[in-house]
Every structure is written in structure tokens, then in C-alpha cells.
């Protein structure tokens, strides 16, 4: 899907809430539409069953998105995998009392070096085990630019980006799905029963009809090869996630990155809990960042004031107060993953590479530890300062 369409859809979802009916999103869902309508009605009227299932409410990951600070896409994370950096960053995750991480694998890196990906991901899981952290890997990606040779290795702060996986021409042509299917089978063969996996996310944000069909086929294939680890779909909203229940999704997701108010966050949490009970399936908030009272950042308008900076404290206490699995974006302080946000100056994350934090208030709100201590440094990483400089933003915020 073109960037402009993705941004338009995201903006609609951010401003109106993920539970509103949008025909553009439901058009691809087919038979799932009736299920969506039924569950929405039950949740809206408080008709969800009182008893919640063990599967829905017994496990609550409190996690983060993890991408090393200087990796601009998943390919780079695995190509430049550094065990020392991994151990250091997992220590930061432990200090926030996290028990889970959501990470992207890379079909394109698997094509380049299958053995290296297996060895590096296995090492990552070993280190997470030592840190007491579970992992939810993402196999395919629905956001970003095309995974050309230039794009996957681009490290320029103004132009480097997340990449689609697989490429658009593969997604559009089922005759070319043999490669992704083989990759999926490879992953399931080696990791479907791995005790360190919290879940297997088959596809993140399958925007557009073609990628929806691709993701549905991959989900069905994963279900045929499933082990003990549950399957998930990275729905940007609840509509998108529910369309994959019939294909085998065990865990649903929603991505309330930039809600407009605390009331909107509370509304989201209320509905998620009600729908978990109705569906008897977990629904996790797998991407959340901060409240933005002005623009969401997905449209064409600039952000309001300092709403470009991290502010997890605006959402964390509300989320921590509810029994809902969640992952904030992101553990490491990084320029925005997607160019639409980066061009507006969006900065994400908690930790600088040296262990300083952007905001002590954020670290304390996420961890629940009001005595958390670290150096607070509200300054862009030196290697990314050309981003704020290019749009006339401050590189450092003074107390």
C-alpha cells in the first residue's frame, strides 16, 4: 500500500479509535465481517460473558518493541547482530521489569544467510532466557518501503526506513509465494515448540487487499504446522485482527500508538477487556507510545509543541492498571521507524545506548518503580541529530 494511503488509514484509526466501523478495512475481511459486528455490539452494550477464560487473562506480557538503536530495519538487526549489544540492551529491559519483547525477523536476511539467522536468533533466545524475558517474533512486515538491495542497507538518518517483507510484487502474485512459504516452514520446524517464545506473529499490519490475502494464506499455513506456541496477527486495529480468527490466529492485537486523550486510552482498555471475554482470546496492545492531543503524526500536518518526544508516562499508569498484555514502542531511543513520523521529528524509546534515559518519569511509569534511577538526558543521539536539525527542531530539551 502506498505511504499516503497507509498514513491516511492510520490517521483515521488514531483519531476515531480502533473500534469504529470502517468499510475500507472490513472489505478485505469477507466472512469475518459478521463476527466483527456481533462482537462489537456485545462489547458496546456490556453483554460480554462475565467469566474470562484462562487463555485470555492468565498471561499478561509487559513488554517492549526491541530493535537495536542503530538498526533502521529488521534486515540490519540480524546482519549486524552483536552479542554484546544484545546483552547490554536486555539488561535495560530487566531494569524496567519487562517480561517480554516483540522483535522482527527478516525474510530477506533468511534468503541471504539462512544459517546465520538461525544461529543469531537462537543466541538471542538464549540471552532472553537468561534475562527472564519471553519473545514474540514477527515473520512478515506490512509497513515500510520496498526491500530493494539499496533500501535494506540504507543507514542515512533522513532516508533509511523499515522495509516491507516480502516485496510487493511477491505479495501480489500467489505464484511467487513458494519462497515465503518455505521460510515459514523453516521457522516452524525449528521454533514452533521453543519454550522461550511467547507467541509467533505471522504478519504485522497487513494493509490492503493483496497483503491481507497473503497474510491469511501464511496464517493458514502456519496453523497447519503449529506446535505448542500460539499464533498471532499484528493487527493495527481490532477489525484487522479479527479477520484472521478463522485462519488460525490465537492472539489478537491492536496498535493504539497515539491516542488523543486519557479518556480514549480508558475507552480502548475497557473495550479490549470486554472483547477478550466475548471472543475468549487474548487481545494485546502491541504498539503504544504516548497521548497526542493535537495531530497524530500520520497525516500531513506537523506535530503540536513537543509531542514529537517520548511521553510513555501519559499512558503507562492507565495500561499497567489493567490486566492487558502490552508492548510499548520502543526499548531503545531511536528516530521513528517509519519515514512519515520521522519527517515530523518523532523520537521513540527509553534508553540511550549508554544507559541514560530520555525521561525518568517514563522509566518509572513503565516499570512501576518510583525509585528507578538513571541519568536523564533529553538529547537526540549524536548519530541522528541531522533529523531535528533538518526541520528546525531542538537537538536538546532543557529542563
Which residue stretches match the model-derived regions?
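N-terminal secretory signal peptides
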Residues: 1-17, 26-29, 40
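Short, cationic motifs built from Arg/Lys/His that form the positively charged side of catalytic pockets
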Residues: 15-16, 102, 223, 287
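C-terminal segment of N-terminal export signals and the immediately downstream linker at the start
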Residues: 33-57
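Charged helix-capping and loop-helix junction motifs
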Residues: 117-121, 215-216, 266-271, 305-312
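Glycoside hydrolase catalytic-domain groove-lining segments
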Residues: 212, 228-297
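Substrate-binding cleft of secreted/luminal carbohydrate-active enzymes
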Residues: 284-294, 299-373, 380-387
Amino acid at each position: 500500500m502506498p505511504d499516503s494511503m497507509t498514513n491516511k488509514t492510520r490517521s483515521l484509526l488514531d483519531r476515531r479509535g480502533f473500534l469504529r466501523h470502517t468499510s475500507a478495512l472490513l472489505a478485505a475481511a469477507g466472512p469475518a465481517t459478521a463476527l466483527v459486528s456481533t462482537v462489537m455490539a456485545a462489547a458496546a452494550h456490556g453483554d460480554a460473558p462475565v467469566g474470562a477464560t484462562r487463555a485470555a487473562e492468565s498471561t499478561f506480557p509487559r513488554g517492549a518493541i526491541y530493535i537495536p538503536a542503530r538498526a533502521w530495519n529488521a534486515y540490519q538487526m540480524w546482519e549486524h547482530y552483536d552479542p554484546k549489544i544484545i546483552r547490554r540492551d536486555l539488561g535495560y529491559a530487566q531494569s524496567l521489569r519487562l517480561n517480554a519483547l516483540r522483535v522482527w525477523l527478516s525474510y530477506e536476511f533468511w534468503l541471504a544467510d539462512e544459517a546465520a539467522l538461525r544461529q543469531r536468533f537462537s543466541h538471542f533466545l538464549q540471552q532472553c532466557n537468561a534475562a527472564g524475558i519471553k519473545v514474540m517474533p514477527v515473520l512478515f512486515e506490512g509497513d515500510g518501503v520496498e526491500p530493494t538491495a539499496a533500501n535494506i542497507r540504507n543507514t542515512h538518518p533522513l532516508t533509511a526506513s523499515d522495509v516491507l517483507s516480502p516485496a510487493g510484487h511477491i505479495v501480489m502474485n500467489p505464484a511467487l509465494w513458494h519462497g515465503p512459504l518455505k521460510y515459514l516452514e523453516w521457522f516452524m520446524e525449528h521454533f514452533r515448540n521453543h519454550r522461550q517464545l511467547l507467541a509467533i506473529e505471522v504478519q504485522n499490519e497487513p494493509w490492503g487487499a493483496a497483503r491481507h490475502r497473503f497474510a491469511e494464506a501464511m496464517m493458514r499455513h502456519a496453523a497447519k504446522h503449529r506446535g505448542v506456541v500460539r499464533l498471532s496477527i499484528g493487527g493495527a486495529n481490532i477489525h484487522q485482527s479479527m479477520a484472521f480468527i478463522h485462519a488460525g490466529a490465537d492472539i489478537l492485537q491492536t496498535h493504539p500508538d497515539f491516542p488523543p486523550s486519557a479518556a480514549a486510552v480508558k475507552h480502548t482498555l475497557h473495550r479490549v477487556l470486554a472483547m477478550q471475554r466475548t471472543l475468549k482470546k487474548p487481545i494485546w496492545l502491541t504498539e503504544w507510545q504516548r497521548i497526542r492531543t493535537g495531530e497524530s503524526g500520520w497525516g500531513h500536518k506537523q506535530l503540536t509543541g513537543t509531542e514529537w518526544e517520548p511521553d510513555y508516562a501519559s499512558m503507562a499508569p492507565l495500561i499497567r492498571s489493567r490486566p492487558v498484555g502490552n508492548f510499548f514502542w520502543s526499548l531503545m531511543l531511536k528516530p521513528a521507524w517509519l519515514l512519515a513520523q520521522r519527517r515530523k521529528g518523532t523520537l521513540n524509546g527509553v534508553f540511550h545506548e549508554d544507559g541514560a534515559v530520555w525521561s525518568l518519569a517514563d522509566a518509572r511509569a513503565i516499570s512501576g518503580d518510583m525509585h528507578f534511577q538513571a541519568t536523564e538526558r533529553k538529547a537526540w543521539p549524536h548519530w541522528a541529530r541531522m533529523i531535528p536539525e533538518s526541520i528546525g527542531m531542538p537537538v536538546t530539551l532543557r529542563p
